[in-house]
């Protein structure tokens, strides 16, 4: 259970208010107008943006001051955040050890993650040798290998075509179901919400509203 308790998140002159609770093993779509604060919300959850006030609780424990790497979550970015000079194996391995000194067991975990996202035999390639969809799969493998209970996605597949984006959404949803991770996904696409979301967090007017059932909200949008 992740709770933002009467939180204020400030970036420059913008302040976002949030008072909400997220349950395990659910998929949340974060929607709202451009500039409403959707990415700001994810940044605060991950620890990239400090709370001005309020608390962030995980399973009842206050993690407001925890460093990003010490939080029970990982994030998948729109640009995949891959290092061009590193191999696929190394890019995924960063999720386990930033110094890339991977032991045998850790190397096995990386290969298993690559296999699970359909990148068998590509561990030695560089990102420039991969298609856009394959690069997205490398980034997803790095998320998978960390085995965190919360996965945050900031429009990670926005640059992909509709068919490939749907494939990636289905893969993310399947992996989350297997690992019982909660997904929190920023999206501008209503079809993405309908495809995989259980709940919707609507962000507008400086407020991230508590989750609502996705089907009901999409049938009666605000």
Where are these regions (language model features)?
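Helix-to-loop junction immediately C-terminal to a conserved catalytic motif
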Residues: 46
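ABC ATPase NBD coupling module
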Residues: 62-79, 98, 103, 107
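Short coil-to-helix segment of the ABC ATPase nucleotide-binding domain corresponding to the Q-loop/switch region
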Residues: 86-95
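Conserved ABC ATPase "signature" region
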Residues: 104-122, 173-174
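Conserved ABC ATPase signature
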Residues: 126-130, 134
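A short, proline-enriched helix->beta-strand linker immediately N-terminal to the Walker B motif
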Residues: 145-149
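Catalytic Walker B motif of ABC-type/P-loop ATPase nucleotide-binding domains
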Residues: 151-155
């Amino acid at each position: 259970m992740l709770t933002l308790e009467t939180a204020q998140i400030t970036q420059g002159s913008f302040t976002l208010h949030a008072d909400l609770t997220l349950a395990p093993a659910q998929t949340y779509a974060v929607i709202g107008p451009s500039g409403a604060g959707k990415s700001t919300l994810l940044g605060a959850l991950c620890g990239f943006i400090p709370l001005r006030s309020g608390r962030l609780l995980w399973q009842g424990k206050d993690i407001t001051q925890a460093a990003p790497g010490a939080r029970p979550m990982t994030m998948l970015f729109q640009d995949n955040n891959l290092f061009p000079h590193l191999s696929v194996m190394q890019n995924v391995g960063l999720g386990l050890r930033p110094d890339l000194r991977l032991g045998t067991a850790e190397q096995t975990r990386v290969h298993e993650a690559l296999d699970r996202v359909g990148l068998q035999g590509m561990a030695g390639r560089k990102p420039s040798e991969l298609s856009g969809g394959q690069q997205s799969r490398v980034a997803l493998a790095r998320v998978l290998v960390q085995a965190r209970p919360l996965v945050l996605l900031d429009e990670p597949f926005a640059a992909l075509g509709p068919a490939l984006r749907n494939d990636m959404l289905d893969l993310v949803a399947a992996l989350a179901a297997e690992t019982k991770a909660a997904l929190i996904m920023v999206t501008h696409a209503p079809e993405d919400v309908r495809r995989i979301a259980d709940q919707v967090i609507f962000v507008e007017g400086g407020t991230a509203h508590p989750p609502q059932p996705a089907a009901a909200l999409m049938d009666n949008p605000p």
